[in-house]
């Protein structure tokens, strides 16, 4: 079965076939239109939360411990960086020079001067070379590119 055919009915069997454990629980914290997905492996765990109110497009509202507000369009770039002046400008310049159009840029931080997270929704695909160049920028700790199918 292909990953693109993932749905609520077959999620458990697909996860188990790949050696993953899947558990479901309900919480009023996210409301009736919210969902949270937690992934763990080895010593790491990440949780992503979002909302999809009826009749409205979905939005990501949390990535890890960071509160964000961004639509999962074609491609999402997720960066972790130091919260210092110039990071957003350097990222925007690099993406613009690479021909990548920014649809939304959401920067979140836990504390001034500490770790920050950028959730950047862009038009079209982003190649591995752009990701590698983002990692070369000062104060960028990690760069992840997520391509959404059918977004």
Question: What are the language-model segments listed below?
Answer:
Residues 1-151:
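NAD(P)-dependent dehydrogenase/reductase Rossmann-like domain
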């Amino acid at each position: 079965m292909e990953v693109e055919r993932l749905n609520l009915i077959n999620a458990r069997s697909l996860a188990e076939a790949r050696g993953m454990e899947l558990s479901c629980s309900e919480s009023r914290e996210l409301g009736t239109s919210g969902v949270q997905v937690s992934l763990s492996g080895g010593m790491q765990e990440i949780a992503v939360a979002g909302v999809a109110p009826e009749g409205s497009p979905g939005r990501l509202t949390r990535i890890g411990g960071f509160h964000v507000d961004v639509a999962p369009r074609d491609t999402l770039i997720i960066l972790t960086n130091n919260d210092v002046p110039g990071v957003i400008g350097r990222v925007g310049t690099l993406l613009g020079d690479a021909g990548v159009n920014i649809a939304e840029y959401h920067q979140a931080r836990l504390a001034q001067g500490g770790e920050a997270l950028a959730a950047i929704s862009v038009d079209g695909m982003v190649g591995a070379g752009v990701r590698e160049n983002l990692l070369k920028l000062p104060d960028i700790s990690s760069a992840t590119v997520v391509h959404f199918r059918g977004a």
